[in-house]
């Protein structure tokens, strides 16, 4: 194959890949490469009702110093949310008005949550402080993943529901 043909092939392949990526983002598709939920292709489904406890959602984290530090530590991926963070894929665990207590695990309105162990250090041995607990304020959501090392609201607390993108629906996923 000539050098010119190789360049042409790579150019066309790059355009096709770029086009597929743009169409996927416009069409509401996301690829999950984190272990918090199954790996693979997911679709963002517009939420046509109030968010409920138990909903699996895509949400943009707020762009603030707390999440900048989380990004620097490698807890967040790069993406198209404000601050160039990738959307989180988490389950809604508590809604506004619900009481969250955190000790060695999460307790919502007096009910312990399974698979919610709280760690004092991250996977690299660095100290990580849990959320202090309290009542979820209006306009906020408390998020969770049953993955033991998940970076979720047990550490960053409730986040604004203004970042809610929609329900997370698996298209083609697998557990490694």
UniProtKB/Swiss-Prot annotation:
Native source organism of the sequence: Agrobacterium fabrum (strain C58 / ATCC 33970)
Gene Ontology molecular functions: serine-type endopeptidase activity
BP GO terms, sorted: signal peptide processing
Stated family: Belongs to the peptidase S26C family.
Alphabetized UniProt keyword annotations: Conjugation, Periplasm, Plasmid, Signal
InterPro entries: LexA/Signal_pep-like_sf (IPR036286), Peptidase_S26 (IPR019533), Peptidase_S26C_TraF (IPR014139)
Entry-linked Gene3D superfamilies: Umud Fragment, subunit A (2.10.109.10)
Record flagged with keyword Signal: yes
Signal sequence coordinates: 1-24
Top-level division of the source organism's lineage: Bacteria
Subcellular location, record wording: Periplasm
Protein name: Conjugal transfer protein TraF
A Pfam family: Peptidase_S26
Function: Involved in conjugal transfer of the plasmid.
GO cellular component terms attached to this protein's record: periplasmic space
């Amino acid at each position: 194959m000539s050098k010119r043909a190789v360049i042409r092939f790579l150019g066309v392949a790059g355009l096709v890949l770029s086009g597929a990526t743009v169409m996927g983002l416009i069409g509401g598709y996301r690829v999950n490469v984190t272990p918090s939920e199954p790996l693979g292709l997911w679709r963002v489904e517009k939420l046509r009702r109030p968010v409920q406890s138990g909903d699996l959602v895509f949400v943009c984290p707020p762009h603030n110093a707390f999440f900048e530090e989380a990004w620097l530590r490698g807890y967040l991926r790069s993406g198209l949310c404000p601050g160039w963070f990738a959307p989180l894929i988490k389950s809604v665990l508590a809604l506004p008005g619900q009481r969250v207590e955190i000790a060695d695990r999460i307790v919502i309105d007096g009910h312990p949550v399974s698979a919610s162990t709280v760690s004092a250090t991250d996977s690299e041995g660095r100290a990580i402080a849990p959320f202090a607990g309290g009542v979820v304020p209006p306009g906020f959501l408390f998020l969770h993943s049953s993955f033991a090392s998940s970076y979720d609201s047990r550490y960053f607390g409730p986040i604004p529901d203004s970042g809610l993108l929609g329900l997370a629906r698996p298209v083609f996923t697998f557990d490694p």
